[in-house]
Design a protein with these regions (language model features):
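Flexible inter-repeat linkers and adjacent short helices
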Residues: 1-33
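Solenoid-like repeat scaffolds
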Residues: 9-17, 49-61, 92-105, 132-143, ...
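"A position-specific structural signal for the A-helix of alpha-solenoid helical repeats
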Residues: 23-29, 66-70, 109-113, 146-157
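Residue-level signature for tetratricopeptide repeat
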Residues: 29-34, 73-77, 116-120, 154
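Acidic, serine/threonine- and glycine-rich low-complexity intrinsically disordered segments
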Residues: 73-74, 82-104, 111
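TPR-repeat structural position
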Residues: 80-84, 124, 161
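Alpha-helical adaptor scaffolds
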Residues: 112-122, 131-172
Length: 173
């Protein structure tokens, strides 16, 4: 990414301002090169909220992934827990736009991460609904265990311990 500022300076401003995808990627570059400036995160998030309908869906997927990674790698992993709420919102947006599904399936790691973040922000009802709605999008051989284990996790956070025990007895290790 060295020298990117010099390249950007040579692109006519009118082109940058009128091209949504180029603008989005320029903001993403700033997000990567100056991670301490949260403003770039919010700027890209706002641009996507307003203009994602005019951007190719593959580009939208990539740009939301940049936002998600920023929340995780630059903020949460460095102790900025405020970004759990942001990460949760990004996951919700990605789900609503079906950006996390590949051939109708959700990667088990994404499923787990969404649940973990949802529980962290205490969105228990939402997480329970997510589990019920998306477990069938996991590989078939993982569905029943994922359902039982993750529902038990929700019930644990809700202090419904008898349900936790009941569900954990059904989990195969």
């Amino acid at each position: 990414l060295e020298g990117i500022d010099q390249i950007i300076r040579h692109i006519p401003l009118a082109i940058l301002e009128n091209e949504t995808v180029i603008s989005a990627y320029l903001i993403a570059i700033k997000l990567l090169t100056t991670p301490e400036e949260d403003g770039h995160y919010y700027e890209l998030k706002q641009l996507l909220a307003e203009k994602s309908s005019v951007i190719d869906i593959r580009e939208v997927e990539i740009l939301y992934t940049h936002l998600r990674y920023y929340c995780i790698r630059q903020k949460i992993n460095n102790g900025d827990t405020r970004f759990f709420d942001e990460l949760f919102e990004i996951f919700q947006i990605q789900l609503s736009k079906k950006l996390l599904l590949k051939d109708g399936q959700l990667a088990p790691q994404s499923y787990k991460n969404i649940i973990t973040v949802g529980l962290r922000v205490k969105a228990f009802d939402w997480v329970e609904q997510f589990i019920r709605e998306y477990t069938d999008k996991l590989p078939e051989d993982e569905q029943q265990n994922a359902l039982n284990y993750n529902l038990s996790n929700v019930y644990f956070y809700q202090k419904k311990y008898s349900k936790v025990i009941e569900l954990l007895q059904e989990v195969e290790y």
